[in-house]
Amino acid sequence: MKKELLILISILLSTLTIAGEIPGQAGNDGKRIKGFSGGMMAHTGFLWGGDNPYNYSPNGTTFGIGGIARVSLSEHVRTGFEGYFSSMGLKEGVVSGSHNKLFWTGVLADYFWKIGKCYPYIGTTVGGGMETAFYMFEGNKQDWLPEANVVLHKQPFLAVDPFIGCDFAVAQGLRLTVKADWLLAINSNGLNRPQGPRIYFGFIFAH
């Protein structure tokens, strides 16, 4: 968790630093960077499916947070990086306190438009991540006794994350954003599960 928090803090600090350094590069001045945008997003979603040897199929609501930083290379094309962590608490079929957690980060590219105060976009992030699964099939989490039927499994994966969203300008340099995605987490055995859609809400600083 410390590593994930450090990466997210780095994204936020990069957002604030770059925002303060390139306020005048959004015009047609011949420079490669036409603008910058970045911020933080919280998300929720519903995941289902299992790829474990215990015939257990976790499902439930996931919650998480993360950050994004992008530079505009043209009037419609952006690139940058983002990172998120997401946690799904589990109760059905396991003892309360079991969970499935994901962390992923990567390089993104998207295509965007400007329609009035709206900036719809579509793109993909490619990178990597880690799944942490903790399943307690029997036992009492309130005591200090060892439990026999407990599984802790970590699995790295290749992250391919297609997304679609829209930024809404609410003030000069400030936008609200909404985004939906479906993370494809690919491990050595194929497609990682559980999986499902997520929806993100947050704020974006843009220059």
Q: What is the predicted function of each stretch?
A:
Residues 44, 70-144, 160, 168-174, ...:
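Gram-negative (and chloroplast) outer-membrane scaffold detector with strong preference
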Residues 4-14:
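Sec-dependent N-terminal signal peptides
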Residues 22, 88, 160-207:
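Predominantly the C-terminal beta-signal and adjacent terminal strand-loop region
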Residues 50-55, 91-97, 146-152, 185-191:
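Extracellular loop and loop/strand-boundary signature of outer-membrane beta-barrel proteins
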Residues 38-40, 122-125, 178-181, 200:
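Extended hydrophobic secondary-structure segments that form protein cores and membrane-embedded regions
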Residues 19-73, 78-79, 204-207:
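Short glycine/proline- and aromatic-enriched beta-strand/turn motifs that initiate or cap beta-hairpins
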Residues 34-36, 59-65, 99-105, 118, ...:
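Residues that define the transmembrane beta-barrel architecture of outer-membrane proteins
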